[in-house]
Each structure stands twice: as structure tokens, then as C-alpha cells.
């Protein structure tokens, strides 16, 4: 039984396959799991198993995604694959599956196609930090020069979107051939190429910083006043660690305030520290209940600042997904639900874009009526009368 070997000692990395439709993303996902299963490092997942992706809801948006897990000698991977192009766009914008790196699959027989470009652009905008390339369908290309030409095109395309095209690892192979070999029970010539790809992923995509190692941030969900003790704010710590005696800032909506943590509690028990993922109450020195409200954040001083105006990459829900039935134009004023609260803002469309239709993805400029704690990569929902009509991610801060 291969299952016994799964241990959690290896560092964990989230990756996914991206690329144009029919270039072989799902076949590659199946091939990776099949080849590694022969080494006792994964459970074999069939193509159909991955392709019939379950639907998930993230920020009110339904996305079909498949998650598979496997190990290499040095790491544990969670790998996400999406069946449809729209699912990729939604996945990347909502951050439903945060990727530490991606495997870009390009058919060697066809070269880069429109969605290849779009997925690279999206990776740049939503902050997928590293890309490794698999040139698939190598068995269909007889001409070595053609293969080199496709590789050159891919490198140029990556460089055009500010990825290091010249240094990006590119491995050629055939996912289908590797999968056929593995199903026959051996790792042959094509399986070796999949192992070579995974070796590149192991070495080129760095191990991500764990949430507890990042700077402290906790969105405020509720505020209480406790007689004789002061003000307690509650919420789930998004990242980092907070301890008694730490200086923190309260950021968003109003002027930034500084205070000191005098207590951290969880389920009414005193804690020495709270860390990423914990739901805690944080007692603040000298802070009045009316000075803090839902929608603000507690954070390490200087680590995040309040902003009103920024650019973001958004996906607008289609009518079938419960979104708007009609397009919207510049000056549309929905609510932007950031972390724990709705803030009204007005939208400016890019030059040359008259209107945005349900189902589109587009880059917009937003100006909020009050400032909130934002940084590159902050995700939020766009809502109208309490229902979600879109999702976005901050791609550039203006002021």
C-alpha cells in the first residue's frame, strides 16, 4: 500500500497547472500523480477523476477545481487543476486556491495561444510568483528546430509579462505517453521527463514563508467593552503572531491609531500568544470601544497602510451565476467587501472600454469613500444589495 508512506515532514507547497485549453493540463496532472504513485509518493488519479472537478464556492462564486496531492523526495504538494478557462480566471482572481507557483503547459505542436498569454498575465496580476514550463506533446513534433522555436516564443512571452523568461526552466515531454507508461506499471523514457519536470519544480519554486512567519494582521470582526479591563477586539488572525506587550496599529476607516496588547484570549482562556488561523480576543490598552469598528485591522506597526484609490483585476459574475443581468459603466458604485466589511466605491473603466458585461474579466480603477487597509494581492468581493456580483484582487495602489 502506497498510502502508508504519506508523512507530513516535508515542507508544503501549493501549485497548479495553467495554460491554453486542450494543451494537456489535466493529462499532465494525471501523469504526475501516476508517475509518482509508482514511487510510492502519490495515489494515482485518473484523468476522468480530475476532469470531473467538484464545484466549490469562494466569495459567492462557484468554481470547478480539482485538488490532488502528491509528494516528491523533498516536498509535499497540493496541486490544483481547473477544467474550464473561466474557472481558471475565477480561481486566480478569488484566490480560491492560492498558488506558490504554477506549471504552464504549452503544446509543442501548437505553441503559445491566447489563453497561454492570458494565464501568464493573470499570474502576473494576482501574484503567482514563479512559473515552470512543460512543453507537452513532444511526441507529435518531429522537427527539433520547431521545438526550439516554441521554447523561444514561450520565453519571450514570459519576459513580456515581467517573468524571468531566460531563466525559466522548460521541460519537454508527453503527458499522455508518460501516463500510458505509468498505467502499464513502469517509468520509462516519457515518465523520466515528468520526473525531470518535478525536479525543476522542487528546485525552482521556493518553499513559501509560513503564515505564522509573516507580519501580524487581524481583521476586526467585533468590539466589546469589558468593565475594569478595557476594550477587546475579536477576529481571526490572518497572518503572523501576536503576544501580550506587542505594539499594534489599528488601521482603516479612520486615522491610524497605535496601542499596546494587554491580553490575548481564546474561548475565555488567557493565551501567551495568538497565531495565524486562531480566533482570538485581543485586549487593547487605553483604546475606547467607539474608536474601533468592524472593517479595521490590527497589525504590526507600519506593515500595512490605509488606501482609497487602487487598480484591481476583477471577474464579473455571469447572469447564470447569479450576477447582474446588464452591463455596467464607469461611475458604477457597488460595495467592496474587504475582509470583514462593505465599503462603497466608484469604478472607472480602462480607456477604450465602454462597458463591462456579466462574465467578463477586466482591470478597473476603484475609489472608495473611506480608506481601508490594503496591499497588493488583497482580495475582495464586489456586492450590490447584499449579493455578490464580482470578485477582485488589488493589482496596483494609486493613493
UniProtKB/Swiss-Prot annotation:
Main location as per UniProt: cytoplasm
GO molecular function, one term: GTP binding
Location(s) in or outside the cell: Cytoplasm
Annotated segments matching region G5: 174-176
Residues passing through the membrane, by range: none
Pfam annotation, one family: GTP_EFTU_D3
E.C. no: 3.6.5.3
HAMAP family: EF_Tu_B (MF_00118_B)
Oligomeric form and interacting partners: Monomer.
Function: GTP hydrolase that promotes the GTP-dependent binding of aminoacyl-tRNA to the A-site of ribosomes during protein biosynthesis.
Protein name (record): Elongation factor Tu
Organism field: Helicobacter pylori (strain J99 / ATCC 700824) (Campylobacter pylori J99)
Amino acid at each position: 500500500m502506497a498510502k502508508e508512506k504519506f508523512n507530513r515532514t516535508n515542507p508544503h507547497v501549493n501549485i497548479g497547472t495553467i495554460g491554453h485549453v486542450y494543451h494537456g493540463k489535466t493529462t499532465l496532472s494525471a501523469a504526475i500523480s501516476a508517475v509518482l504513485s509508482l514511487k510510492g509518493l502519490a495515489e494515482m488519479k485518473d484523468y476522468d477523476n480530475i476532469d470531473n472537478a467538484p464545484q466549490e464556492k469562494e466569495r459567492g462564486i462557484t468554481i470547478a477545481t480539482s485538488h490532488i496531492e502528491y509528494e516528491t523526495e523533498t516536498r509535499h504538494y497540493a496541486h490544483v487543476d481547473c477544467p474550464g478557462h473561466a474557472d481558471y480566471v475565477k480561481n486566480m482572481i478569488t484566490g480560491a486556491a492560492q498558488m506558490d507557483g504554477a506549471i504552464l503547459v504549452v503544446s509543442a505542436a501548437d505553441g503559445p495561444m491566447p489563453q497561454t498569454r492570458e494565464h501568464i498575465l493573470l499570474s502576473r496580476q494576482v501574484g503567482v510568483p514563479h512559473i515552470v514550463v512543460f512543453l507537452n506533446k513532444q511526441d507529435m513534433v518531429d522537427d527539433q528546430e520547431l521545438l526550439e522555436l516554441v521554447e523561444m516564443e514561450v520565453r519571450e512571452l514570459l519576459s513580456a509579462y515581467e517573468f524571468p523568461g531566460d531563466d525559466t526552466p522548460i521541460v519537454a515531454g508527453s503527458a499522455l505517453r508518460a501516463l500510458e507508461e505509468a498505467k502499464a506499471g513502469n517509468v520509462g523514457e516519457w515518465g523520466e521527463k515528468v520526473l525531470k519536470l518535478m525536479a525543476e519544480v522542487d528546485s525552482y519554486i521556493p518553499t513559501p514563508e509560513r503564515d505564522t512567519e509573516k507580519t501580524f494582521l487581524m481583521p476586526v470582526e467585533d468590539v466589546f467593552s469589558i468593565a475594569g479591563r478595557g476594550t477587546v477586539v475579536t477576529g481571526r488572525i490572518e497572518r503572523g503572531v501576536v503576544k501580550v506587550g506587542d505594539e499594534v496599529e489599528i488601521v482603516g476607516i479612520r486615522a491610524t491609531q497605535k496601542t499596546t496588547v494587554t491580553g490575548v484570549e481564546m474561548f475565555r482562556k488567557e493565551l501567551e500568544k495568538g497565531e495565524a488561523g486562531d480566533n482570538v480576543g485581543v485586549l487593547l490598552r487605553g483604546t475606547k470601544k467607539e474608536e474601533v469598528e468592524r472593517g479595521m485591522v490590527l497589525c504590526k506597526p507600519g506593515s500595512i497602510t490605509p488606501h482609497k484609490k487602487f487598480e484591481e483585476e476583477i471577474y464579473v459574475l455571469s447572469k447564470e451565476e447569479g450576477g447582474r443581468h446588464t452591463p455596467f459603466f464607469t461611475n458604477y458604485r457597488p460595495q467592496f467587501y474587504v475582509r470583514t466589511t462593505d465599503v462603497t466605491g466608484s469604478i472607472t473603466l480602462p480607456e477604450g472600454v465602454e462597458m463591462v458585461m456579466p462574465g467578463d474579466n477586466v482591470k478597473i480603477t476603484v475609489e472608495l469613500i473611506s480608506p481601508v487597509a490594503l496591499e497588493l494581492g488583497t482580495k475582495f468581493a464586489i456586492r450590490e444589495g447584499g449579493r455578490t456580483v464580482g470578485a477582485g484582487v488589488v493589482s496596483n495602489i494609486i493613493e
